Swiss-Prot record:
Keyword Flavoprotein: no
Transit peptide (residue range): 1-78
Name recorded for this polypeptide: Ribosome-recycling factor, chloroplastic
Signal peptide span: none
Length: 271
């Protein structure tokens, strides 16, 4: 090994400390005199691994001897920059995906709240007890809109008609189903002022739940960054910078939630 490697080895050995151990460098003559009565270990490094092994090795033709009170060996691994960057990237990607999924959920929940115009998405949240198992209505029936104020439900299995009817009655849709034994028709009455206000409260609650979900995602990401800091993979300044970027992302998605909410509120209040 080159002289620079010996210097590096010496530096690592001087900085290495272990419980019940006393580490020091000895020259060749010390090794020759004390080899019979001294536990010895050597240092070697490969990539980002540091290992202390029992025995004697030579660097540039000269042995490096390490005294220890106990004959112990262990491997210590330090994360590479590439690995740290990969962990950061994974946290960022996961955070953005979860926030995007939250937006999709909010849209779906808003679509299930009826407005003046009939839409199959109004039935997205309705679950039917089908052979003892709750399933989504759209998975067991075809839903269409014959006109702007009605919905037509055609079940794939006619025996599920009663279960579908019951699910609609117990939902918060606010309509009465008409079951003719073949299909179910839903006629949507015009929204009254009071009903609009009630639905506006429902939408407001759904929006707030979405905002809470986004904040919780931010909290989880921040905890992940702090964990990397405790593991000495990130510095305090790194975490501050990442937290600032995370807050910008959070603000962006909070604005998306607010925008979707305002749009739905306008639809509800439109006569």
């Amino acid at each position: 090994m080159a002289a620079s490697s010996l210097s590096s080895a010496t530096s690592y050995l001087h900085s290495f400390r272990r419980r019940n151990s006393c580490v020091s460098l000895q020259g060749v003559s010390d090794m020759e005199c004390n080899i019979a009565r001294t536990n010895v270990s050597v240092w070697r490094s490969s990539a980002n691994y540091v290992r202390m092994d029992c025995g004697v090795k030579k660097f540039s033709g000269k042995a490096v001897v390490v005294k220890q009170l106990q004959n112990r060996a262990g491997t210590f691994r330090c994360a590479t920059m590439e690995e740290v960057e990969a962990e950061k990237s994974l946290i960022e990607t996961n955070t953005k995906q979860r926030m995007e999924k939250t937006i999709e959920t909010i849209r779906s929940n808003f679509n299930s709240v009826r407005t003046n115009r009939a839409s199959p998405t109004m039935l997205d949240r309705i679950e039917v007890e089908y052979y003892g198992t709750p399933v989504s209505l759209k998975s067991i029936a075809q839903i269409s809109t014959p006109d702007a104020s009605s919905l037509l439900i055609s079940p794939y299995d006619k025996s599920s008609l009663k279960a579908i009817e019951k699910a609609i009655v117990t939902s918060q849709l606010g309509v009465s189903p008409n079951n003719d034994g073949e299909v179910i028709r839903l006629s949507l009455p015009p929204l009254t002022s009071d009903r609009r206000k009630e639905l506006a409260k429902v939408v407001s609650k759904l929006a707030e739940e979405g905002k809470v979900a986004v904040r919780n995602i931010r909290r989880d990401a921040l905890k992940s960054y702090e964990k990397l800091e405790k593991e000495k993979k990130l510095s305090e300044d790194n975490v501050k910078d990442l937290s600032a970027d995370l807050q910008k992302l959070t603000d962006e998605y909070m604005k998306k939630v607010e925008s979707i909410y305002k749009q739905k509120e306008q639809e509800l209040m439109k006569v």
